[in-house]
Amino acid sequence: MNQGLTFWGWLFLAAAWGTILVLTIYCFSRVLLHKKKKGTGPVETGGRAQWATRIGLILAMAGNAIGLGNFLRFPVKAAANGGGAFMIPYFCALLFLGVPLMWVEWSIGRHGGVHGHGTTPGMFSLLWKHPAARYLGALGISLPFIIVVYYTFIESWTLGFSWFSGTGKYFGLDNREAMGQFLKGYQRVENNQFFSSWLPLLVFLAITIFLNYYFLRKGISKGIEVLAKIGMPVLLVFGIVLAVRVLTLGTPASGVSSVGAGMGFMWNPDFSQLGRATVWLVAAGQIFFTLSLGQGIINTYASYLREKDDVTLNGLTTSMTNEFAEVILGGTIAIPVAVAFFGVVETKLIANEGAFNLGFQSLPVIFQKIPMGQIFGAMWFLLLFIAGITSSVALTSPAVAFLEDEFKWKRTKAVNTVFAVMVACTVLVVAFFKFGFLDELDFWAGTFGLVVFATIEIVIFSWIFGVKKGWKDMHLGADMKVPKIFKFILKYVTPVYMLVVLGAWTYQEAIGKFLMKGEEQSRHPYLWGARAMFIGLILVTVLMVWLAWRKKNKQAVSQ
């Protein structure tokens, strides 16, 4: 079990890393060397903001996609579902689901922005001349907003643990059980010797919310783009430094295995896993979530493009940047170092317990056992925080853009209103966290809801608007011609793929989740409360869409 990379392991690692590196270098070389075209058509519609630079746009899009899941969720899923063999369904999903949907969302976003719409209610109504379109599009505002309500809370943990690492607060807790108590005390799940008040949690949560507010209030080019230009290079440098440090650990004196065995555990293929439908489903789900598809965010960010700004090369570059962070960096840090110190058997148990146990309980124990552990621990959690804040700022953007575009509010008023509602909802998440409130929201908004929305989106684009028109729109001003086979993929393969994923998740997960199977009776009121928040925020968004279009119709009649 503690063997290093086998021949097949090396082959899968080389193929995955090589493909991603070649495509990433190709994309960025095309982006950086491409000369800006003149006379690219309409520059603004209704005075909407724009991206100052192309590289800033790509880094912001990549920052939206690169989040906690790249460094925690991916390695756990890959290690548990066939190792190197997992990359076969993973890359199939990237080819047939991820990249096509990325191009679709970039195209829909740019098309909507040219006509003054920065969110999916307006965008869908342009593609489908039916009143239902704008109400279905409301999910592209409500879902990311619901996600950011709890995502910001998790994000604040990473900031707190970066501080605790740098100051050595948890040093001395040399086993996972003690670190688990430390985490629960910080989260206020329990009172213990480590934390006896809410103050530390609330301080780091307040700092996190303020930083999100600051960058959003500054706008597109002066806020979000600046954050991406600073945050993304720092994140990638930190990730590379940590990956190199892990690879040079060898066999730690205090460990029970080696990093080589960890890489073997991560990459040696178990081909028997490929016969399990669940593995293919997990791979599709990972691609779907890692690229932030079905959230309405890519659409909103792309709406700040000009009419003939490229979306094909930009979309592929965004995807490859995310894959570099996930497969090469994320796949090298957490699992290999866990195997080196805990061995394969215990690492499997850690992986089965979930990504957060790996990130917040196991790795802090390891940082205490390596030279300069405080520095590397602080760097790890700061990396997660940067990944988190670039994503949370993006998640909040659709709600702000909707109020700006459809109600003509000033950005300050829109940001203030959105954050007031967000803070009120986050208070409930924090207060009821130990009763499963966050997990319930995460399933319905952050898992199931996104699959539903993306399925609606691909059907509207490929079948109602039509692939022929969509293909033409996608290539307007394109710096890269998409192979024509993707016409077929967009019309048939991707929609069927999405329907299969949606059907499978409904059968395997959603029904049992709805019936609260396995949940303690004492938790039921809180879980229903989370569902009430989920449904309530969607209904409020639908109402806001109705009010916006009623206002538009009245103005049209009066003119």
Predicted features and spans:
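Transmembrane helix-boundary motif of multi-pass solute transporters/channels
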Residues: 56-93, 297-299, 305, 314-316, ...
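Extracellular loop-to-transmembrane helix junctions
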Residues: 78-106, 200-201, 450, 530-540
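Membrane-interface "cap" regions at the ends of multi-pass membrane proteins
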Residues: 33-72, 101-106, 110-138, 306-310, ...
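Transmembrane helix-loop junctions in multi-pass membrane proteins
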Residues: 68-77, 84, 212-222, 243-260, ...
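C-terminal membrane-solvent junction of multi-pass transporters and transport-like membrane proteins
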Residues: 136-141, 407-419, 444-530, 558-559
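Inter-helical loop and helix-membrane interface segments of multi-pass membrane transporters/permeases
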Residues: 2, 45-49, 77-81, 111, ...
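Membrane-embedded translocation segments of transport machinery
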Residues: 47-55, 225-389, 393, 406-408, ...
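Transmembrane alpha-helical segments of multi-pass small-molecule transport proteins
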Residues: 56-57, 61, 137-141, 169-217, ...
